[in-house]
Amino acid sequence: KIRADKKERSRYKEVYIMKLEEKNLIVKRAYKSVYKCDDCIVKVFNEGHPKSDVFNEALNTARVEETGLDIPKVKEVTQIDGKWAIAIEYKTGKTLEDMMESDMKNLEKYMEDFVDLQLQVQSKKSPLLKGMKDKLARQINGLKDLDATTRYELLTRLESMPKHNKVCHGDFNPSNVVVGKNGKMTVVDWAHATQGNASADAAMTYLLFALKDQKVADLYLKLFCKKSDTAMQYVQQWLQIVAAAQLSKENELEKDFLMRWIDVVDY
């Protein structure tokens, strides 16, 4: 049985290597390339990418699987040509982002479905996921673009915010929602998942929308607050905190936008 399992893993790796060609490349980021390989996708991380980050993404995904949410399951963590890689189930369909952009007249309907899906995710608990407030504090503490006084004020505000334990995606935006032919929506890419405050997760989603289109961001926030019975001001209290956390990802295209949010902090 053990030999058979090893043989099967070896066969999978050979298939992955054969399929890792430009024609199968789905997404290329600064630190990883994502390929379509038969019934799965394979994320291949650059050499030098922290091993702990790779295993953390796989572990996050596995823990969210255990909540009962229907998400793409982890199939394998392996090395390919000296680079760490994760194989995850492939979900057929279009991204909700593509559907929104090609059918703007139905934007509000798509956004309602999007918010319903986010609330479904946030209804779950996963006690072993990392705590959101701890992660946000680490990200803010590590920022070199902010002076010590600003970091202190942000951390003080973070500490004063309520601590919850809902499953939060951390990068919940329409590009991470796949819609199948039957209309079923699936959330992908759980690398940033934590347990924490749903309104903080909503604040991050709002910022991600606002980076592209302020009107769409405002529509999202209105629907989220209505459907979750949350005061808009409460979500807005998280905006400076999550803007600082997003700044830690060092995306130069977002830097000026995020700094403007951080600069308007009213202490």
State each model region's role.
Residues 24-55:
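ATP-binding glycine-rich loop module of kinase domains
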Residues 51-67:
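The N-lobe alphaC helix and its flanking beta3-alphaC-beta4 segment of protein kinase-like domains
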Residues 73-84:
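Short beta-strand micro-motifs within the conserved protein kinase catalytic domain, predominantly
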Residues 105-132:
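Internal "kinase-insert"/substrate-recognition segments embedded within catalytic cores
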Residues 123-170, 181, 186:
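An alpha-helical support segment within catalytic cores of ATP-dependent transferases
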Residues 177-179:
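Hydrophobic residue at the +6 position relative to the catalytic HRD Asp in the kinase catalytic loop
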